[in-house]
Amino acid sequence: MEALETHARWVSETLVSGGRLFFCGNGGSAADAQHLAAEYVVRFERNRRGLAAIALTTDAAVLTAVGNDFGYEQIFARQLEALSSKGDLLI
């Protein structure tokens, strides 16, 4: 339970300070990353303003270009290099 509370605190602090959440995963976890990002952006259980969340698993062109040019192990790092800022959180 302590790990979950810590995670929730990190997410809350990131969003309150204007940071963005980035989600990534491989295989089935890639689908989970997309689902979680969508819940933050759209809504979860009740209407509220959208929250800044991005799944790094959605752009096939970027994923395959990075994999081809830099190696599969760089597909998320390269996107974070281009898109993230200090204060963002990778999940």
Predicted feature descriptions by range:
Residues W10-S84, L89:
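Glycine-rich, small/polar surface segments that engage phosphate groups of diverse ligands
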